[in-house]
């Protein structure tokens, strides 16, 4: 016989070597949709109880980006892995549909017509816009291979959801936490609405930095400072000159020392610790500190406004610091949180004479009609004109900007609705829950959100917009006071649920259908009312999702086991959800919170259109396939910022190819195995038993990593298993047994049985990450061998049995592997010298001490095959020749390597001293001859 290759049992499978992910993935999506893979996965799980991951709703505006893709893939990995571990882990995707970005887009489309249209018409356009992008994003998320209840998502604009949101506001009212008052809040002049803390982002901004003197003409100055009031001044520093028209006081710290500094015949009061730096700023070369007094003694002195004829008293405040400025703080209660609190303590007027565009009203001398930022240079000019400007500089500092339009915001006192943080100990209870009731992943998230809530102001929940859930309240036309009642609010909320477009009911229903019969204002007795036009903060919308979703749907539960979002949500959804739940339920809405970082480019830079480094998910999908995007998510420690580049993706393509090829090899070598020929673990070849032990250990590490959300460990363990443990060792050793042994021989069936078990464990472990490929592999397992599951995600633990060897057996194999590594080293010099080309060309003698020799012999397997050599002997260590390879890693071992004697079998390539004993099979060894004769090969 001349062509022995045809007699080998080479791998045979229809599973393609080339992935062609971009073409095959859409086909797989159709398959999943056809069998309802999500339902099949759900039906197969639940034995261990329920596990709830609650989806933080992305905004229904625009296409998805890499950050949202990362987030959805992470959630998908959690849901799939938990289901495959036996939990009923459902995924209900959600969308945040209300708010400013959508309303802005609609305003741009409507132009000037928007002002003429009733609110419900504008809201209809907003709803249509949200629906459009919700459908777009749903398709894009499904393209990532994410399974979920896509046909039954939750939407914040759904009538039932809007009703639940309004009902939660009623619950807060019933608890007494909702107040309406005039306070300084973040205000965007461009968007013309109040902003919450979570809607403010900080960017570098250049502002004017000015030092201003206030006349201190109070007669009491003579007694307190021992100087003539006619020559006395108090000096402030500010970076917001536009707030000076609304100055009502100057604040000093009661415990700081304040100096009286004489310069050019005048006396200036400022913090003693800042005299030197201030004098340098002012250009004072000759000045003298004539006295110092504690700040507490300055309280009650009355300064005069620098350009208006009105008093500006000196007040005390603990927040005054000495790290910059003068230690004397310009106080405008209408434009700062701390200023406001000080104003309340001292009964100061809360001035904020601005319209919604940030323009000064006609009542403001010198600056009427100017925007606040237009007013800055005019205020400085006025100060210079009256002689009260001591110094002017520019300063670059971190300044609040609107999250939507990215423009600088201001603090402005307006009448708003708030959730009071101190009422019913809301703040204290939230802080306690953070410390005691929630697991934060990473752990630093606990401190971050704790600090945010510990120092946050009352929650401003009102917005001066149209597209959102209206604040259910009535305003008295007589006195302007508001009225609402929890029971009435709940009744209105119930009507929202029954209305086809939810809270459009508030806008479409005439006033008489809203106002309770005979309602009189409790403040003035009036009976003329109008509806509140403010809407709820969208963070209140999404923050009450625990009520609208977790408590309402049968496939979820309250509280959730996990909230998983980007780290910016410590001040966003995690934050608002916690306050909303603690305020009305008394418990947090989640048991654990996991955060991921931001996606950055390969150099660690934030993605920016101006830099030109933005990568869209669709670009990656079109080039590599969604599977590579999923592998990228799993390959990184997502808790930090995550880098992505073509180089990174190319490396992952190589890693993916190695995993795929391993699966293909496994499939190719079980093609002729039948269920009846599966070998029990107890009688399998010892090497096969050990291989299953390796895979079982890897499986345990992978499942632990899934449980701890350490997906990068899943990837690395999976990759190492395929590349190192399987391809480089076990599968390499098996080739002779699989290819050259008799087709139905016990040793070959043992190997095939091991490969089947390994393959089933492999597809189960890789499915949450490499979902497309795992399903493809699963579908290519011969039907008779494939577990009866509709989809790979429906595999149960019983479908993938796990096996371990004894600790003694494991110890023996660890010794074998250590020796195998040393044998490879010992052969290398001969390979380099050209004496041998392959390890099968060698005869190896292991000179081992008694302990090692006994361990090696006790394996009960053919070590020659394990080391992939043609001949192997074990000899006493003391017989080792002088030139034997001495191992540094394995004690009691030396290795002799020589060219294998005899000739190479033309079929199995193993050297034998006798070949061709059967004339019908010249060049074949005895083993191969027997196989050929038995099989009838000619």
From Swiss-Prot:
Binding site for L-isoleucyl-5'-AMP: 565
PROSITE patterns the UniProt entry points to: AA_TRNA_LIGASE_I
Binding site for Zn(2+): 905, 908, 925, 928
InterPro entries referenced in this protein's UniProt entry, alphabetically: aa-tRNA-synth_I_CS, aa-tRNA-synth_Ia, Anticodon_Ile_BEm, Ile-tRNA-ligase, Ile-tRNA-ligase_type1, Ile-tRNA_ligase, M/V/L/I-tRNA-synth_anticd-bd, Rossmann-like_a/b/a_fold
Chief location bin: cytoplasm
GO MF term set: aminoacyl-tRNA deacylase activity; ATP binding; isoleucine-tRNA ligase activity; tRNA binding; zinc ion binding
Enzyme class: ligase
CC annotations in GO: cytosol
Cofactor mode of binding and number, as noted: Binds 1 zinc ion per subunit.
GO annotation terms (biological process): isoleucyl-tRNA aminoacylation
CDD domains: Anticodon_Ia_Ile_BEm, IleRS_core
Sequence intervals crossing the membrane: none
Substrates-to-products reaction catalysed: tRNA(Ile) + L-isoleucine + ATP = L-isoleucyl-tRNA(Ile) + AMP + diphosphate
Annotated ATP binding sites: 609
Main function: Catalyzes the attachment of isoleucine to tRNA(Ile). As IleRS can inadvertently accommodate and process structurally similar amino acids such as valine, to avoid such errors it has two additional distinct tRNA(Ile)-dependent editing activities. One activity is designated as 'pretransfer' editing and involves the hydrolysis of activated Val-AMP. The other activity is designated 'posttransfer' editing and involves deacylation of mischarged Val-tRNA(Ile).
Subunit and interaction comment: Monomer.
Record remark on domains: IleRS has two distinct active sites: one for aminoacylation and one for editing. The misactivated valine is translocated from the active site to the editing site, which sterically excludes the correctly activated isoleucine. The single editing site contains two valyl binding pockets, one specific for each substrate (Val-AMP or Val-tRNA(Ile)).
Name listed for the protein in its UniProt record: Isoleucine--tRNA ligase
Native source organism of the sequence: Nitratidesulfovibrio vulgaris (strain DSM 19637 / Miyazaki F) (Desulfovibrio vulgaris)
Name of the coding gene: ileS
